[in-house]
Amino acid sequence: MQSDMTSRSEKLHVGIIMDGNGRWATRRGLSRLRGHEAGVETIRRIVEAAPKQGIGTLTLYAFSTDNWRRPKAEVAALMTLLRFYLANEVQSLVKNGVRLTVIGRRDRLPDGIANAIARAEAATAHGSTLHLRIAVDYSARDAILNAAAKAAALTSLTREAFSQLVTGEAGLRDVDLIIRTSGEKRLSDFLLWEGAYAELHFTERMWPEFDAGDLAEALAAFHGRERRFGGLQAIMPEEVPSLSRV
């Protein structure tokens, strides 16, 4: 049963680990690049569906810091796809009221990618229907470590202030639900601070297969859970012992 602390009327923050592009392609005798291209199509579908399903913030794990270890050709292809997405989706994002933010390091990205990110963020800055956050060259542990280094120079610190140092944004809602596709069951260094009390949903579906129905299924499971945030399970009236029976 859903806790009052997260009602259905609230706009949720959902994070998705988009996993399984390569395996989806390999099983079909296709190149891994074709799998990543299909994954971009899924991003379009989910970005469109998210606001209709009560999501206000959507964080997508696109490229981790550890992904630099992949073959250079695959990394180059992923960067090309990212540049293509940024260049071709901005107009649609603006039209649909989507604000885009890219989180993670930018100093190691090709100049063309970094510039495309800046242009896309500026163009979509006033979107209010959905906040789309794409994690590129991202590591949650690095984000926490960098925040701690900045916090060391402060004389006082609140949890809210530290959260802003970690996320780079004031007032960002903590993550309510993290979804991972492909059947893997781990967080892979994703949203470790802001997802401290996130519910987890793992699906066998590969990312290119994931659709609005799968998203709705994950959200239905989420709304069926009781979020305790460290507290105790709610006790139903019939479970409370009567003094007359004590």
Curated annotation (Swiss-Prot):
Pfam annotation, one family: Prenyltransf
Any one biological process term the GO annotation gives: polyprenol biosynthetic process
HAMAP family named among the record's database cross-references: ISPT
Known role: Catalyzes the condensation of isopentenyl diphosphate (IPP) with allylic pyrophosphates generating different type of terpenoids.
UniProt-recorded name of the protein: Isoprenyl transferase 1
Cofactor binding note of this UniProt entry: Binds 2 magnesium ions per subunit.
Keywords: Magnesium, Metal-binding, Transferase
Family of the protein in this entry: Belongs to the UPP synthase family.
Annotated binding of Mg(2+), by residue: 19, 199
Residue positions binding substrate: 20-24, 32, 36, 64-66, 68, 70, 180, 186-188
Cofactor requirement: Mg(2+)
InterPro entries: UPP_synth-like, UPP_synth-like_CS, UPP_synth-like_sf
Cellular component, GO, one term: cytosol
SUPFAM superfamilies: Undecaprenyl diphosphate synthase (SSF64005)
Keyword Cytoplasm: no
EC number: 2.5.1.-
Active-site residue numbers: 19, 67
An annotated Gene Ontology molecular function: ditrans,polycis-undecaprenyl-diphosphate synthase [(2E,6E)-farnesyl-diphosphate specific] activity
Subunit structure: Homodimer.
Superkingdom to which the source organism belongs: Bacteria
